[in-house]
Amino acid sequence: VLQAGLVLFAAASLVAAWAGSAHSLIGARGVMGVAAAMVYPSTLATVPQVFRDRQERAIAIGVWAGVSGLAIALGPVAGGALLRHFWWGSIFLVNVPVIVIALIAGALLVPESRDPEPGRFDLVGAVTSTLGIGLLVWTIIEAPGHGWASRTSVLGFVGAALLLTLFVVWEVRSQSPLLEIRFFRNPRFSAASATTAMAFFGLFGFIFMITLYFQIVIGWDALTAGLATLPYALIMGAMSPLAMVLTSRLGTKLLVGGGMAVSAAGFLLASRAQTDSPYWTFIVPCMALMAAGMGLATGPATDAILAALPAAKSGVGSAVNDTTREVGGALGVAVVGSVMSSWYADRLTELWTPLQVPRDVLGAAKDSVGAAMSISKQLPAAVSSPAISAVGDAFMEGLRVGCYVVAAACLLASIAAFLFLPAHDRPDPEGRHTGHPQARTPQSDRPAAADG
């Protein structure tokens, strides 16, 4: 699956690089998403197969988590650099040589592993989950424009709820479920999964907010804005392996719960940002708190998810971990973006009304911060300067509320971790944890209950 996914991703990248229309580009990106869904869980699933020793596996998971977070944060830097010096297709073409190296290394170094009871592909589960999550994200994104209580928004939320409910019911009854819902009966497994989702909710929400702040409010180009996020990427990448070393001494509960609390503190501090906040003495400390907290939490949380399953089911644990990351990230962008958009639009209306800006111009400015900046510069001289200032103030109001939302999510994850995650897990002789639910077998239709 890993090798096939890499080949498919490389082929789709080549198509995307030379796409002749928006439709072909979107199609290629969709195929890249399918390929990524094949690759990403497979990378983590190999860790328990290669590293049998408990300590070695923990460090490997920490490195994996750190590299994952680092790659996400480095994306804007690489993209900005390529777009500055090459044509737009280079952001896809750069994937190919990396994949060639990965294919060779995978063939030589990665051992074969498979689920002894793989079951059949769950088409109903795949369709209902994709449609449900897709509809939910779309509704959240579009709600500020249509109105949160509008017919479109209400129907969207109801439809998403029905689809996701159908997904859960089907998964519980299915003999070959896409997602093993029964594992979530274990509060430790659920708390670790929720923490991972909230961490990536915060990570993607942060990248969304800070990119707009750097490019629109401060006025930096894409490369400079990407470079400005490097402290976040480097700190998170460094903290993840360190967290796995500390877990054996401090325990999963303290690392995950404390890490998410530290991230929440970073977002609360960031909520005090202003349009002229200094980068090195304010923005970087905020990023340091966010990144350090997430780096401390994500590795141990990932290890807790894998530790809940026997080694033969490591692919299931990896898939759950991947799902929580992707869903959390998608919801992070959707929720934070919608909240920011709503507060920004309301605040801009309040600030621009005394300037007597035409209603149609105000409507266009409310739809986009970038458009508002462009419009402000074209207004009469007496109005232009206060209009630009108002756009910045309105954006900061949205960013402030967005930070509150992410901080609340991180605090909830912290509370769940302190309540349900173990202080210390007990490794068995083969390096796996004990006291966690086992995979479904023909003799057992549900996982064993966790011990105290």
Kindly give the residue locations of the regions a language model identified.
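Short helix-capping/hinge motifs at transmembrane helix termini and TM-loop junctions
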Residues: 19-20, 52, 109-112, 144-145, ...
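Interfacial helix-cap and linker-helix signal at transmembrane-aqueous boundaries
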Residues: 78-86, 140, 214-215, 246-247, ...
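Transmembrane core module of solute transporters
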Residues: 13, 23-25, 87, 124-125, ...
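Flexible cytoplasmic inter-helical loops of multi-pass small-molecule transporters
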Residues: 112-127, 174-178, 426-433
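Discrete transmembrane alpha-helix packing/kink hotspots characteristic
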Residues: 71-75, 207, 239, 298, ...
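Hydrophobic transmembrane architecture of multi-pass small-molecule transporters
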Residues: 101, 304, 320, 325-421, ...
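C-terminal membrane-cytosol helix-exit motif in multi-pass small-molecule transporters
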Residues: 97-114, 132-141, 160-174, 413-421
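Helix-loop-helix hairpins in multi-pass membrane proteins, especially solute transporters
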Residues: 1-125, 151, 226, 234, ...
